[in-house]
């Protein structure tokens, strides 16, 4: 079970709702993955006219999965705060995935503005899930601001590169053992999702890896299974890697001709 801000969710997978081939494929992908939450941009939900926006919102409601609005596209504190407040009215939720982009090419989060915006929103009663980098100090500042969970990236949004800074992510996990950490952005394969879950991360958020795959519905299922298996592996406790071979079969009771002494 995934616990965020005192609320428990049956899945450790979160799924984005952008860039699917058709609304029906989006709906089927959500139903197949059974994610804890689905993320949606206020701008996306309201685009294409009132009828289109209402239809998209109705589709999301039909899935029965909790909605996590985000502030995608925001580049200033005021813009992010205003968008979050509007999203709370539209989606009737205090949950917000806080995104504040500092660079248009890498889509890297602006951690300085992120901390400021998080402080404002938390004081306003929001449950903030900040999209951040794997920088330990920046993550600590977000926790100091009142965030109870973090969403560090694995790689830049949409790249599918997997965990490019494995060392930093593992350090983050080690130094913040009691903080829910959800890997957000940069994963492209189910095996990459399983890997970060094996490292002890609490969840994974995906969008592009599913929506732009050849078969989003089956890819959604593949990622759901990968997240589950990765978590099971972490909880089971994998064997430690060794430099030398170690026989798995015991030597006790071997025939005399296999003995080292004759």
Curated annotation (Swiss-Prot):
1-deoxy-D-xylulose 5-phosphate binds at residues 158, 185-186, 207-208. Its main location: cytoplasm. GO terms for cellular component: 2-iminoacetate synthase complex; cytoplasm. It comes from the Bacteria. It is found in: Cytoplasm. GO terms for molecular function: thiazole synthase activity. Residues 243-262 are annotated as: Disordered. Pathway: Cofactor biosynthesis; thiamine diphosphate biosynthesis. It catalyses: [ThiS sulfur-carrier protein]-C-terminal-Gly-aminoethanethioate + 2-iminoacetate + 1-deoxy-D-xylulose 5-phosphate = [ThiS sulfur-carrier protein]-C-terminal Gly-Gly + 2-[(2R,5Z)-2-carboxy-4-methylthiazol-5(2H)-ylidene]ethyl phosphate + 2 H2O + H(+). CDD domains: ThiG (cd04728). SUPFAM superfamilies: ThiG-like. Keywords: Cytoplasm, Schiff base, Thiamine biosynthesis, Transferase. The keyword Cytoplasm applies. InterPro entries: Aldolase_TIM, Thiazole_synthase_ThiG, ThiG. Its EC number is 2.8.1.10. The active site is at 97 (schiff-base intermediate with dxp). GO terms for biological process: thiamine biosynthetic process; thiamine diphosphate biosynthetic process. Belongs to the ThiG family. Catalyzes the rearrangement of 1-deoxy-D-xylulose 5-phosphate (DXP) to produce the thiazole phosphate moiety of thiamine. Sulfur is provided by the thiocarboxylate moiety of the carrier protein ThiS. In vitro, sulfur can be provided by H(2)S. Homotetramer. Forms heterodimers with either ThiH or ThiS. This is Thiazole synthase. It comes from Neisseria meningitidis serogroup B (strain ATCC BAA-335 / MC58). The gene is thiG.
């Amino acid at each position: 079970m995934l616990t965020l801000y005192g609320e428990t969710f049956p899945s450790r997978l979160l799924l984005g709702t952008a860039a699917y081939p058709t609304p029906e494929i989006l709906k089927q992908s959500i139903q197949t993955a059974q994610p804890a939450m689905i993320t949606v941009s206020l701008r996306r939900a309201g685009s294409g006219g009132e009828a289109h926006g209402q239809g998209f919102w109705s589709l999301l409601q039909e899935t029965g999965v909790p909605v996590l609005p985000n502030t995608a596209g925001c580049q200033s504190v005021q813009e992010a705060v205003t968008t979050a407040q509007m999203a709370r009215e539209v989606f009737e939720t205090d949950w917000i995935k806080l995104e504040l982009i500092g660079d248009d090419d890498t889509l890297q989060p602006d951690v300085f503005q992120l901390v400021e915006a998080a402080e404002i929103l938390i004081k306003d009663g929001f449950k903030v899930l900040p999209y951040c980098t794997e920088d330990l100090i920046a993550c600590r500042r977000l926790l100091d601001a009142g965030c109870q969970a973090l969403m560090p990236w694995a790689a830049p949004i949409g790249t599918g590169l997997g965990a490019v800074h494995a060392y930093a992510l593992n350090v983050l996990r080690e130094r913040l053992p009691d903080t829910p950490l959800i890997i957000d952005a940069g994963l492209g394969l189910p095996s990459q999702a399983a890997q970060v879950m094996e490292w002890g991360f609490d969840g994974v958020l995906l969008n592009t890896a599913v929506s732009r795959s050849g078969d989003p519905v089956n890819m959604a299922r593949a990622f759901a299974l990968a997240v589950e298996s990765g978590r099971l592996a972490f909880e089971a406790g994998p064997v430690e890697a060794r430099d030398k071979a170690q026989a798995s079969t015991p030597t006790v009771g071997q025939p005399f001709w296999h003995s080292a002494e004759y």
